């Protein structure tokens, strides 16, 4: 009888220890390893979708800014931009600049902190009265690409919208300081 009680006590103690460890460290959510991000593409399209801004930021801190002005009757599909399908050259201009290395590091840290790679592809928020447009962010590493965003993305109060908004806030800040 004494041995059975000791075994029960030992098993109970082991289970309690395991539950405490899972509570403190999590149960395998996320890889824990920081992603080595090589490129971030950020697209902003206001509600009227006449002008679209696309920023391609590389790990060497270079920025290509595409200012797309839709002039033809052919509607621009935003997701096509991420596949390199730009409209005719008359419909956009391109300029180059650089973000600071600190700005790039801040962006990379935020993308890892928010576990952006695990965000849903559709972060749309349709309950808002104001039409702020569509926002998309694609991150690329040596092996993977992940695109998230949508209509009024980042404007909701749920967890994914808050994470998305924290990334676009950093993007807006570092792009405003780009030179």
Predicted feature descriptions by range:
Residues 53-57, 94-97, 135-137:
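Hydrophobic/aromatic beta-strand elements that line small-molecule binding cavities or substrate pockets
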Residues 47-87:
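Glycine-rich catalytic cores of cysteine/serine-nucleophile enzymes that process amide/ester linkages
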Residues 23-26:
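C-terminal motif of bacterial Sec signal peptides marking the signal peptidase cleavage site
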Residues 15-19:
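Secretory targeting and sorting signals
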Residues 30-52, 109-179:
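Short, well-ordered, aromatic-rich surface patches in folded extracellular/luminal domains
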Residues 72-119:
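A short-motif feature that recognizes glycine-rich, charge-decorated loops
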């Amino acid at each position: 009888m004494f041995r059975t009680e000791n075994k029960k006590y030992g098993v109970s103690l082991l289970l309690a220890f395991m539950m405490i460890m899972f509570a403190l460290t999590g149960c395998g959510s996320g890889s824990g390893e920081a992603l080595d991000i090589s490129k971030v593409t950020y697209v902003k399209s206001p509600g009227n979708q006449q002008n679209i801004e696309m920023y391609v930021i590389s790990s060497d801190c270079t920025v290509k800014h595409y200012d797309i002005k839709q002039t033809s009757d052919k509607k621009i599909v935003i997701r096509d931009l991420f596949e390199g399908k730009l409209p005719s050259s008359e419909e956009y201009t391109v300029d180059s600049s650089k973000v600071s290395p600190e700005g790039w590091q801040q962006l990379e840290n935020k993308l890892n902190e928010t576990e952006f790679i695990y965000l849903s592809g559709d972060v749309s928020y349709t309950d808002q009265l104001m039409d702020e447009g569509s926002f998309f962010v694609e991150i690329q590493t040596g092996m993977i690409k992940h695109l998230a965003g949508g209509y009024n993305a980042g404007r909701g109060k749920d967890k994914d919208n808050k994470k998305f908004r924290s990334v676009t806030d950093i993007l807006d800040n570092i792009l405003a300081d780009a030179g």
